[in-house]
A protein has these predicted regions:
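Short beta-strand-loop/turn "lid" adjacent to the catalytic site in phosphate-handling enzymes
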Residues: 1-16, 42-46, 77-98, 121-124
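Short, conserved acidic/polar surface loops in the N-terminal third of protein domains
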Residues: 2-6, 26-28, 184
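Conserved beta-strand -> loop -> alpha-helix junction used to position metal-binding or nucleic-acid-contacting
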Residues: 13-23, 27
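Residues that line or immediately flank small-molecule/substrate-binding pockets and catalytic motifs
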Residues: 17, 126, 312
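Active-site core segments that coordinate phosphate-bearing ligands/cofactors
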Residues: 22, 29-85, 95-106, 110-113, ...
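Short linear loop/turn motifs
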Residues: 120-128, 234-237
Length: 390
């Protein structure tokens, strides 16, 4: 988030890893059902609601100077064109937004004693919000007067890029973390899912998150001083289920990690030291990432017959995609374009300058499915049995 004073100068800027709001989150915990009904999110110190409340309580001098609260992407647009604007899918992650009705929640803000006059206007993804100013042109090299188009949140832009725009469709963005989402045309609240706005009006998302799946893969790669191609080759030589070896590396269901499970690799007993090679570690983390995706599909009440559309760095691996199809027991559809979130944002930009009438038309014209992975019956049956024990 970025906060501006009345002169348009930044007085606070930090990503979601700023957890000073945790103390305020403790205060908010008694209001969690009310807060989640409005915002679609559980109480957490990383969201804007708790951070604003923390500043009001512990640093009132800064809080009193706030003129505008922005998400980081809103702030970048402000620097380019001077407009103070947010977008529903972006604002959804602030826990300050009425996700059902698409507006900042005065009801919620008043209930916790926060100001209601410090939030930007709301525009839809693909709408022009201004043009590049002379100052921004000098600093960036962009041409003065270039249209600035309202963007969308990264996962939602990925869904647009994959043309996942119908109620019931499923998608996973397998990057640093892996959000797992079901599109719905009505506002739903569920104990085990987040509810966010899609990048297209009239649609919402039921979202889980499998945790730091991409970081887990990178950590294992760096730990063994290897690369992803070698990891895959060695993992392929290991049987399904890794001879009983299991990996727990920050995986989550709907963004909530088990408080009783420590991270690491678990071996069956008795443990025969020579039985496990590097490939076991590699396959174990790939499989664990896929198990977490499946658990989140179940948490968001995914239809068992619906295919799973996927994008993100992890989906560059045929090996990963194949395991994912087997573990989830459903068709996995990849994309021809590797940078699918960038493609989704380009669709919004082209819509904003009039090349397409709306986001749906742009997605229909510009999105192309890649390779499709079918679950293998014998592997699917093995994982069904293994997951009962896992």
């Amino acid at each position: 988030m970025v906060w501006l004073d009345r002169f348009g100068k930044e007085i606070y800027a930090a990503p979601s890893v700023d957890l000073r709001g945790e103390e305020a989150a403790d205060i908010l915990s008694g209001k969690e059902p009310f807060i989640k009904e409005i915002t679609g999110l559980p109480v957490s110190g990383m969201f804007g609601l708790a951070r604003l409340l923390w500043y009001k309580k512990f640093n009132e001098a800064v809080y009193d100077r706030i003129d505008t609260v922005m998400m980081i992407s809103d702030w970048i647009c402000y620097l380019l064109c001077g407009s103070k604007v947010s977008e529903p899918s972006v604002a959804s992650s602030s826990q300050l937004f009425d996700v059902k009705n698409g507006k900042w929640s005065s009801e919620l803000l008043k209930s916790v004693g926060l100001r209601t006059d410090i939030f930007p206007e709301i525009s839809d993804f693909g709408e022009q919000i201004g043009t590049v100013t002379k100052e921004a042109a000098c600093e960036t090299g962009l041409k003065e007067g270039t249209p600035v188009i309202c963007g969308a949140a990264d996962s939602q832009a990925g869904l647009v890029g994959m043309n996942v725009l119908k109620s019931g469709m499923l998608a996973a963005v397998a990057g640093t973390t892996t959000p797992v989402m079901r599109v719905t045309d009505r506002y739903e609240i569920d104990e085990f899912a987040f509810t966010n706005r899609h990048g297209v009006p009239g649609l919402w998302l039921q979202e889980g998150n499998a945790g730091i799946t991409g970081l887990a893969l990178r950590w294992v790669r760096d730990l063994f001083r290897t690369d992803y191609e070698i990891m895959t080759q060695e993992a392929m030589s290991v049987p399904l289920g890794c001879d009983g070896m299991r990996c727990f590396s920050g995986h989550e269901i709907a963004g909530r990690r088990s408080s009783t499970c420590r991270s690491g690799f678990v071996f069956p007993t008795p443990w025969v030291l020579d039985s496990y090679k590097r490939g076991h570690f590699f396959r174990a983390v790939y499989e664990a990432n896929c198990y977490a995706v499946r658990a989140n599909l179940e948490a968001i009440k995914a239809d068992s017959e619906s295919p799973l559309y996927v994008c993100g760095g992890q989906t560059a691996s045929d090996f990963y995609n194949g395991i994912l199809a087997d573990v989830c027991g459903r068709q996995v559809i990849t994309q021809k374009e590797r940078e699918i979130t960038g493609l989704g944002i380009a669709m919004g930009a082209f819509t904003g300058v009039g090349l397409y009438k709306d986001i749906r038309e742009a997605a229909a014209e510009m999105s192309f499915a890649g390779k499709i992975y079918e679950p293998k019956h014998d592997c699917q049956a093995f994982y069904e049995d293994w997951l009962e024990k896992y």
